[in-house]
């Protein structure tokens, strides 16, 4: 554990950011899984709506640096293929 006051503050901020980032990534993964589940159940109408939400969450995660931009694009592309198939 840090002894210097500024290092203690940085450690606290780091932990807060880690928790926040984990929350955003979890929401993103849940949105993707929702789309995949709807596609599996042939509920394409709701899958398209869920895809819009998942796409926004993937873009936001990429913008914040939680995942790489190419990874977000790849996931969106694969989801779009499933929804439009």
From Swiss-Prot:
Binds directly to 16S ribosomal RNA. Keywords: Ribonucleoprotein, Ribosomal protein, RNA-binding, rRNA-binding. Belongs to the bacterial ribosomal protein bS20 family. Gene3D superfamilies: Ribosomal protein S20 (1.20.58.110). InterPro entries: Ribosomal_bS20, Ribosomal_bS20_sf. This is Small ribosomal subunit protein bS20. The lineage of its organism: Bacteria, Bacillati, Bacillota, Bacilli, Bacillales. The gene is rpsT. One of its GO terms (biological process) is translation. GO terms for cellular component: cytosol; small ribosomal subunit. The keyword Glycoprotein does not apply.
């Amino acid at each position: 554990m840090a002894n210097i006051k500024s290092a203690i503050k940085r450690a606290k901020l780091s932990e807060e950011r880690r928790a926040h980032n984990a929350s955003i990534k979890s929401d993103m993964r849940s949105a993707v899984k929702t789309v995949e589940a709807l596609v599996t159940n042939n509920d394409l109408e709701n899958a398209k709506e869920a895809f819009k939400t998942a796409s926004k969450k993937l873009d936001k995660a990429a913008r914040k640096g939680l995942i790489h931009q190419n990874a977000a694009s790849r996931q969106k592309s694969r989801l779009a293929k499933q929804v439009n198939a």
